[in-house]
């Protein structure tokens, strides 16, 4: 068993100083004081004096098997490793495909999802890719959702020249199929929408919600934190109807000419409109960060997304923008847990919940200790558990 003592607990709501007892992968007790000497067997004590204890991050947008490829085979990014997640506080992750579903497959994504689960974190996946009809393991997106316990929904691209250029009837049909499969399998059945830069933006999603009475909460439009007032307006309209809006986290503050804004700034904009509870943060980790020439016709360089962007945006939101930590944690914990149907076991620090826990310095949001499924992954800033080939 493990006891985390003397930490200020944020569940994400502030609970004050508590001791947390962990065993069997779950939080067994949370009390003002727990004496390790009265417990049977070996008990490891983590002293969190001066630190905050929070739920582990839930990252709903990762390229487990790598991404990229738009600049030739040499620009395919490598697979993610376990420590890319654990060192950055991610204890639950959802993998998906991107542009390339030719050299990347949903079968390979499933294998990597299972590998992450075996290595110690919790991993799920979305079937499909940018394209429609959706590539699938069992022959269709709805069959994957029904029969594969690791599949929580579908990935799709809209308003992007690399996307399928589907019609509104096609989208309505996909929504109906996903909805039925979600009901049968008792899953959330979400559709994560990669939102491109074409002028239509999210118009097709709004139309299918209006014309076909599709539930707006099926949709998770992502990459919405752009300096595009019309895109933000459309996303807010969908959020008012129940959709969750995902911001892609950054690792720096963009300059004035950059078309992106920080996830923290998007969250503040939605908060002013009373829509903060509809916002999630994700990292796009493992995906490519292409650097284009001036004409946007050729890639001249490539970076790789990292999960450390989550911590950067949290620190920005709390320590520079002034939001209370209890509130700022929600897009990284409680809200994505709800989106992915995990809110009865993840996203909170509470008795019987999975022991996915972070010990952080509140002044910087630097992560000192990480527990995933009750196992210590990082202790005193040192990696304790690594992936199979790390």
Predicted regions: what they are:
Residues 1-3, 9-54:
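Histidine-rich, glycine-flanked metal-binding segment
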Residues 7, 24-27, 338, 348-390:
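C-terminal cap of metal-dependent C-N hydrolases
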Residues 7, 20, 25, 50, ...:
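Divalent metal-coordination and catalytic microenvironments
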Residues 43, 48-111:
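Metal-associated gating/positioning segment near the N- to mid-region
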Residues 68, 72-74, 80-94, 144-159, ...:
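Active-site gating loops and adjacent loop-to-helix segments of metal-dependent hydrolytic enzymes
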Residues 179-290, 298-300:
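Active-site core of metal-dependent hydrolases
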Residues 272-359:
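His/Asp/Glu-enriched, well-ordered alpha-helical/loop segment
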């Amino acid at each position: 068993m493990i006891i985390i003592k003397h930490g200020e607990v944020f569940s994400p709501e502030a609970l004050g100083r508590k001791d947390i007892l962990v065993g069997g992968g779950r939080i067994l007790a949370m009390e003002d004081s727990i004496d390790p000497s009265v417990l049977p067997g070996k008990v490891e004590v983590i002293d969190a004096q001066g630190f905050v204890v929070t739920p582990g991050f839930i990252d709903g947008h990762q390229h487990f098997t790598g991404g990229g490829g738009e600049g030739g085979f040499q620009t395919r990014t490598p697979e993610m490793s376990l420590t890319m997640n654990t060192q950055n506080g991610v204890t639950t992750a959802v993998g998906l495909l991107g542009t390339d579903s030719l050299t990347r497959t949903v079968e390979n994504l499933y294998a990597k999802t299972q590998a992450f689960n075996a290595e110690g974190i919790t991993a799920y996946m979305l079937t499909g890719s940018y394209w429609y009809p959706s590539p699938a393991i069992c022959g269709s997106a709805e069959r994957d959702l029904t029969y594969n316990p690791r599949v929580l929904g579908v990935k799709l691209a809209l308003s992007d020249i690399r996307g399928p250029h589907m019609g509104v009837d096609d989208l309505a049909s996909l929504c109906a199929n996903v909805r039925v499969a979600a009901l049968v399998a008792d899953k959330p059945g979400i559709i994560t929408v990669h939102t491109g830069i074409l002028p239509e933006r999210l118009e097709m999603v709004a139309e299918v919600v209006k014309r076909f009475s599709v539930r707006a909460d099926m949709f998770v439009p992502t990459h919405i934190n752009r300096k595009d007032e019309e895109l933000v307006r459309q996303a807010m309209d969908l959020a008012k109807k129940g959709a969750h809006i995902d911001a892609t986290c950054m690792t720096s503050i963009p300059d004035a000419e950059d078309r992106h804004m920080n996830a923290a700034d998007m969250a503040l904009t939605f908060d002013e409109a009373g829509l903060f509870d509809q916002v999630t943060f994700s990292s796009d980790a493992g995906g490519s960060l292409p650097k284009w020439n001036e004409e946007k016709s050729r890639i001249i360089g490539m970076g790789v997304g990292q999960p450390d962007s989550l911590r950067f945006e949290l620190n920005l939101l709390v320590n520079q923008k002034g939001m209370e930590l209890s509130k700022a944690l929600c897009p990284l914990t409680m809200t994505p847990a709800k989106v992915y149907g995990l809110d009865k076991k993840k996203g909170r620090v509470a008795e019987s919940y999975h022991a996915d826990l972070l010990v952080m310095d509140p002044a910087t949001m630097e992560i000192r200790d990480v527990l995933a499924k009750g196992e210590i992954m990082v202790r005193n800033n040192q990696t304790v558990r690594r992936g199979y080939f790390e």
